[in-house]
Each structure stands twice: as structure tokens, then as C-alpha cells.
Amino acid sequence: MMKTVMMMLAILATAKAEPQLAAASSRVILLLDFKKAYDSVAREFLFLVLLRFEFSPMFVRMLRKLHDGTTARFLVNGELSEPQEVVSGIRQGCSLAPLLFILAAEVLALSIQ
């Protein structure tokens, strides 16, 4: 998601810097495909966003501990793999996951306004 946000910020900056683009159309339709959205959120970015939105550092530390050390196993040809560490993304199935994703996406929404 961080790459998507950075790309959109670059596009917006270019549109603002190019007067002919702004003159051609004062309205822009923005469509984003959040494919594998929860997996695409950089955890450090999420924690920084939470701190910027003035969530308590204690709450952010709690979320960090919840996400640190996350592992996943895969079923390949009927065999279960060894646990693999998951280093990015929001824990799927967590009741906070939709809210955390919305907060991370809010950075993009605020930059568009």
C-alpha cells in the first residue's frame, strides 16, 4: 500500500505542478485497486500513521507486539510447510484489521483533498 500511496502522491504533485493539466480538467476520477489490500500495508507506515493520528504510544506498542513474530504455514501438494515469518500486512481475521486499513488509507484520502 505504501507504494500505491507514494505513486498517487507523485501523480497529484505532478498535476498541481503542471498548469496545463489543471486547466484541461478541474475534476479527476480516481480509481484504486486495493488488491490484497491488507497484505500490502507496510507495518512501520501503519504505526507511524497511528502516532500521527495521536493514538497513544502504548496502544501502538500493543499493536506492534500483536503483529511482531506473525507466522504462516502453507499447504503445498498436501504437505504443510514450516512456519514462515510474515513481515508486512495487517493480521487478517483480527477484529481491528478493517479499522487499521481504513486509517492507513486515510493518508491517501487526506492528500487528495
Swiss-Prot record:
Primary role: Secreted effector that dos not suppress the host cell death induced by cell death-inducing proteins.
UniProtKB keywords: Secreted, Signal, Virulence
Family annotation (InterPro entries): RT_dom
Coiled-coil intervals: none
Pfam families hit by this protein: RVT_1
Cellular compartment(s): Secreted; Host cell
Presence of keyword Signal: yes
Predominant location: secreted
Name of the encoding gene: RXLR78
Family: Belongs to the RxLR effector family.
Name assigned to this protein: Secreted RxLR effector protein 78
Organism: Plasmopara viticola
Domain notes per entry: Has the canonical translocation RxLR motif, but lacks the canonical EER motif, which characterizes most oomycete effectors identified so far.
Sequence motif RxLR, residues: 61-64
GO cellular-component term (any): extracellular region
Signal peptide span: 1-17
